[in-house]
């Protein structure tokens, strides 16, 4: 991780770290899919890539223009675009597309992305890894709220072990110090890198999926369900950074 520009929170990544990040994406995505399907073989797990530019209207109200990178509009008719602060809205849009296009896609459905996101983070030393441009690996795992399965609680220890197994630092699960409005509960996974316990992953039970899900039993009328989303959000840059700390010891 090189600060060549001499601008806090803007870094270059060299080939070794890029390959390591790619390895993390492969391993983590395989492990999450295996965990979900071991809990319920019906899970449909898919990957998608969405543009890093997105309509401003899709960004959560929790982000003001001072938090994100907004494109200047050249005319009043031009769609206001921003560099995405997270992958979730574009993943949700794809999930709605799948569920609404008569493709017989059903819940439970997990869609994940690995890619760059952008936020106007306050300038901090690089060791805190609060970057203005950063890599996220985010899984949105949607299921009916009345399913009776607590996938959030079931995911905590498998995800902690998964991360600890590759970063090779002590890892713990703690309640998040912030609870987003969209979440019933959020837990963080932190690793001890010798300088601090650093958050590398958050696991939330989200209630903000944009639509209800309609199932059609073999007999009787269709049933509308509320949708709950298990979100597993992993900071890939922080995983690479902490892996390098462990490897240097």
What are these regions (language model features)?
Residues 1-249:
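TRNA-recognition modules of translation machinery and tRNA-sensing kinases, especially anticodon-binding
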């Amino acid at each position: 991780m090189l600060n060549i520009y001499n601008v806090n929170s803007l870094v270059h990544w060299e080939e070794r770290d890029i390959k390591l990040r790619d390895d993390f994406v492969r391993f983590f995505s395989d492990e999450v899919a295996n965990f979900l399907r071991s809990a319920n073989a019906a899970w449909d797990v898919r990957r998608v890539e969405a543009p890093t530019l997105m309509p401003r209207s899709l960004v959560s109200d929790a982000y003001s223009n001072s938090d994100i990178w907004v494109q200047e509009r050249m005319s009043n008719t031009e769609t206001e675009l921003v560099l995405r602060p997270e992958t979730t809205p574009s993943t949700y849009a794809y999930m709605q597309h799948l569920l609404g296009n008569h493709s017989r896609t059903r819940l439970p459905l997990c869609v994940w992305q690995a890619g760059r996101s952008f936020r106007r983070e306050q300038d901090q030393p690089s060791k805190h890894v609060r970057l203005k441009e950063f890599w996220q690996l985010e899984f949105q795992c949607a299921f009916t709220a009345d399913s009776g399965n607590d996938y959030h609680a079931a995911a905590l220890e498998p995800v902690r072990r998964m991360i600890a197994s590759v970063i090779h630092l002590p890892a713990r699960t703690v309640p998040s110090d912030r609870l987003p409005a969209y979440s019933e509960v959020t837990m963080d996974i932190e690793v001890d890198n010798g300088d601090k316990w650093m958050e590398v992953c958050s696991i939330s039970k989200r209630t903000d999926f944009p639509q209800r899900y309609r199932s059609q039993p073999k007999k009787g009328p269709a049933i509308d369900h509320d949708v709950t989303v298990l979100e597993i959000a992993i900071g890939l840059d922080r995983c690479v950074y902490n892996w390098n700390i462990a490897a240097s010891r």
